[in-house]
Amino acid sequence: MNKLGLVGLALLLTGCATPPPKDPENLCNIFKENRSWYKAAKNTEQKWGVPVHVPMAMMYQESSFRHNARPPMRYFLGFIPYGRASTAYGYAQAKTMTWDDYVRENNRSWARRSNFADAHDFMGWFIYKSHQVNGVSKWDAYGQYLNYHEGWGGYRNKSYNAKPWLIQVSRRVDDRSKRYAAQYRQCQKDLDRSWLWRLFFG
């Protein structure tokens, strides 16, 4: 494929990408706007035993639900770019090395960090592993986010104690997770209705 074709393909894929939800503060509205996201979240719940609201609260913090989110570019002398702070990318802000571990361990070579379902499954896997490795409850958004940010070894070594800002961010993630959980209880029955029921009864 020539360069023009590659540019065209990139523009097409960008145009097809799902925009961030209009109301990211409300989990019910997020899933009502993007029914496929709810299906992906339920698949993660069934596969990894992870409650719907925890990875969604973490994803809000990581990318604000932007498919192509990246850390900001760093500049030398204020104008010479010299790379980004990390290889984090996509909905889950998964770093390349950790993503590659996930892909290899789960035989998902087709998975993409810019795909919501893949990124959500990655988060479910990471939360599951954090529970296995460090004994952190899958429902504990605070502890799970610390694992997610610091890695399993960093969490065991309590590296977060030297980062007061990270503890504050993790508390915000936990607060959001609790709000999302309360909202989800109000709309789960409606979201779980079959497509046929929604077709006839709205």
Model-identified regions with their sequence ranges:
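Sec-dependent bacterial lipoprotein signal peptides
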Residues: 1-16
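Export/targeting segments at the very N-terminus of extracytoplasmic proteins
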Residues: 17-76, 131-134
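Extracytoplasmic and endomembrane cell-envelope/extracellular-matrix remodeling and assembly machinery
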Residues: 17-39, 43-46, 167, 171-202
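Second-shell loop/turn segments in exported
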Residues: 26-31, 41-45, 81-89, 105-116, ...
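Short, surface-exposed glycine/acidic/tryptophan-bearing loops
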Residues: 69-101, 145-147, 165
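Catalytic and substrate-binding regions of cell-wall glycan-acting enzymes that process beta-1,4-linked
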Residues: 83-85, 139-191
